[in-house]
Amino acid sequence: MASRQTAIPEKLSRKQYKAAMKKEKRKKRRQKMARLRALEAPPEEDDDVSANEELAERLLEIERQRLHEEWLLREEKAQEEFRIKKKKEEAARKQKEEQERQIKAEWEEQQKKQREEEEQKLQEKREREEAVQKMLDQAENERIWQNPEPPKDLRLEKYRPSCPFYNKTGACRFGNRCSRKHDFPTSSPTLLVKSMFTTFGMEQCRRDDYDSDANLEYSEEETYQQFLDFYHDVLPEFKNVGKVIQFKVSCNLEPHLRGNVYVQYQSEEECQAALSLFNGRWYAGRQLQCEFCPVTRWKVAICGLFEMQKCPKGKHCNFLHVFRNPNNEFREANRDIYMSPPAWTGSSGKNSDRRERKDHHEEYYSKSRSYHSGSYHSSKRNRESERKSPHRWKKSHKQTTKSHERHSSRRGREEDSSPGPQSQSHRT
């Protein structure tokens, strides 16, 4: 009863309890039947059972031995693979160490070469500095020193003809790209200040081809008035250095001539002093660029057709279009009187004075000022009246021919009375 209580739990429902009791009864019945069969079985069956058990044990042993051998083979194979893997890893490690050692050796060698090169450069720099210092000391001690002569192979320069525009005006529109040679003077009595004079009209000249209304923003009178202000502001500064015998300001519209200022002094020493004084200074928000100019003859530099308003190239002309100086100042230099022989006397001097009084500068600017007034219409009416009266034109033509004959006869008598070489040089 106690075993039954231990086998069957107490806290069960009635249905579960009955099922458990039936299960226990069946179990006991099977056990009982098994004991009876064991008692009734013959001894041969026991021998067969034991033989079967031994056979099963041998088979199990054989199977266990086979499995053990297979395991040994697998283990040996795994050990062999492990050894091969270790060898490969060791070889890779040694190869990596060898590569690192080579890289380190190459890096150290490269660093060594760099140090040697730096030391060599420092040594060369010290040697150059010592040589320069030695040359400076020698120059200070001897007071006579010059640069070493260039190699003989480099002394000869390929011949190139001189640029005529640079020699005449001191500027070339091609600049450094010019195929001809620019003979830059080392000393000259003429100083050139590039693009010193600037106005709104001169700066906007490039827009005329695209903006037809740009010229309405300025006029020639305003530009000339600005030039007069510039003239009275700048010229006294140049005169403080030395005697100025020519002062010209270019009104060209080409970039290489636009606003250039030409100042000719009486001597080259004064021009050198002006160059050292004005070069690099600031004026009107711009830094001045001064240089020596080869122009000493103004008759070949200034465009004569521009003075008569007949220049065919207009704003593309490469000769100087200059403003007229107030009161015709420096008019003697316009005809290169300072470059001519000082022995002109007699009628030749009178003729030169007469020609100077009839300067084309006055004609040009008087025409430009009268262009906007009514004089243009009056001259047009006069020409129309002359065309209507041919007899009057014939009469005036006869009078002019007679006056020319009188002047030519008078000039011939004056030439006969004047010295020959001087008059010939004046005519040429």
UniProtKB/Swiss-Prot annotation:
Polar residues bias (residue ranges): 419-428
Composition bias, Basic residues: 23-35, 389-410
An example Gene Ontology CC term for this record: U12-type spliceosomal complex
Organs and tissues of expression: Highest expression levels are detected in the brain, and lower expression levels in other tissues like epididymis, testis, bone marrow or muscle. In testis, expressed in both Sertoli and spermatogenic cell.
Zinc finger extent (C3H1-type): 157-185, 297-324
Keywords: Metal-binding, mRNA processing, mRNA splicing, Nucleus, Phosphoprotein, Repeat, Ribonucleoprotein, RNA-binding, Spliceosome, Zinc, Zinc-finger
Subcellular location: Nucleus
Acidic residues composition-biased segments: 42-51
Record has Transcription regulation as a keyword: no
InterPro entries listed in its UniProt record: Nucleotide-bd_a/b_plait_sf, RBD_domain_sf, RRM_dom, RRM_dom_euk, U2AF_small, Znf_CCCH
Chain positions found as Phosphoserine: 50, 340, 375
MF-aspect GO terms: RNA binding; zinc ion binding
SUPFAM superfamilies recorded: RNA-binding domain, RBD
Protein name according to UniProt: U2 small nuclear ribonucleoprotein auxiliary factor 35 kDa subunit-related protein 2-like
Source organism: Mus musculus (Mouse)
Gene: Zrsr2-ps1
